[in-house]
Swiss-Prot record:
Coiled-coil regions, chain positions: none
Gene3D superfamilies: 3.30.300.20
Stored Pfam families: RBFA
Keyword Signal attributed: no
Gene Ontology MF, one: ribosomal small subunit binding
GO-annotated biological processes: maturation of SSU-rRNA
Assigned keywords, A-Z: Cytoplasm, Ribosome biogenesis
Organism of provenance: Agrobacterium fabrum (strain C58 / ATCC 33970) (Agrobacterium tumefaciens (strain C58))
Family as reported in the entry's similarity comment: Belongs to the RbfA family.
Function: One of several proteins that assist in the late maturation steps of the functional core of the 30S ribosomal subunit. Associates with free 30S ribosomal subunits (but not with 30S subunits that are part of 70S ribosomes or polysomes). Required for efficient processing of 16S rRNA. May interact with the 5'-terminal helix region of 16S rRNA.
Name of this chain's protein: Ribosome-binding factor A
Length: 138
């Protein structure tokens, strides 16, 4: 009988993803990556998602104070092999060091869109004061 596959990440995937995120953050904070684009930019790593076999780590990053993120993301992907090698001492329990992939994190942009939508006059009108007396009488 085949095991049912779940789309939710396992506890192990979440734990390893958080360890990789912390290690990458330290590598970037210490300035170990020698690239003008990366050195002059504050980069926030919001999440690292691991593949089920733990061989691929996709890091979602947000370069702060930069309008166009594509150059920074490209620079991070160019230095992915170097950073993978620097993960070794911090992730000694791993049998294989995961391949690193960097992607632009759009969750903050989505948050801003939802916030703007909730603050729009049309939605505010619908969310206006409710009749609490009607609720209490029923």
């Amino acid at each position: 009988m085949a095991k049912a596959t779940s789309s939710a990440p396992s506890q192990r995937m979440l734990r390893v993803g958080e360890q990789v995120r912390a290690a990458l953050t330290q590598i970037l904070q210490r300035g170990e990556v020698r690239d003008d684009l990366i050195e002059g930019t504050v980069i926030s790593i919001s999440e690292v998602r691991m593949s089920p076999d733990l061989k691929i780590a996709t890091a979602y990053v947000t370069p702060l104070g930069v309008a166009d993120h594509t150059d920074i993301i490209s620079a991070l992907n160019r230095h992915a092999k170097f950073m993978r090698g620097r993960l070794g001492p911090q992730l000694r329990q791993m049998k294989y060091m995961p391949e690193l992939r960097f992607r632009d994190d759009t969750s903050f942009d989505n948050y801003q869109k939802i916030d703007a939508l909730l603050r729009s006059p049309e939605v505010q009108r619908d969310l206006g004061p409710s009749n609490e007396k009607d609720d209490e009488q029923n």
